[in-house]
Amino acid sequence: MRAPRLFAVSLLIFIPTLALASDAEWRRYVIPSTGTSVDMPVSIFTSDGGAPESGTGRRFFTEDRRADLTVQSVPNPENDSPATFLAKQRPPAGIIYKRITPDFFVVSSIRNDRIWYNRCNRGNGTLNCVLINYPAAEKRQWDSVVTRISNTLRG
């Protein structure tokens, strides 16, 4: 009797998270000064966190602040390739996923039980990026959200 009850409780806990991407309200966010744009789930990232630490754009948080999304354009005055730009940023050890092309780079790592995902597209004098971080324990629930955000980054 205890196992079915435990299963029911875990369903109640995870059902809202499991429906994350499919039930989300999505809108296009545009950085006016650069034209960089991305689809973002406005029903998930409900709090405006203001300007990012570097570059132009915006930072957003979930209501409980367990996850955040930054959309930004970072100056690339030397027009470095994505590989060179990434190397200059000196990414941390522990990268679990990396893909670099002439047009973009993607890196992901786990730090402090959080997944950090970063995609930057090469622009004209900028790198246009999305940075997403969320609890590692919720990876499966966030996969479709991260994929859609990443695949819709333009600029």
Where are these regions (language model features)?
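Bacterial N-terminal signal peptides that target proteins for export
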Residues: 1-8
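N-terminal "mature-domain start" segment
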Residues: 22-53, 153
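Acidic/histidine-enriched, beta-strand-rich ligand/metal-binding domains
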Residues: 26-28, 116, 147
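Conserved polar/disulfide-associated segments of primarily extracytoplasmic proteins
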Residues: 47-144
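Short, low-complexity, Pro/Ser/Thr/Gly-rich segments in the mature regions of secreted, periplasmic
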Residues: 142-154
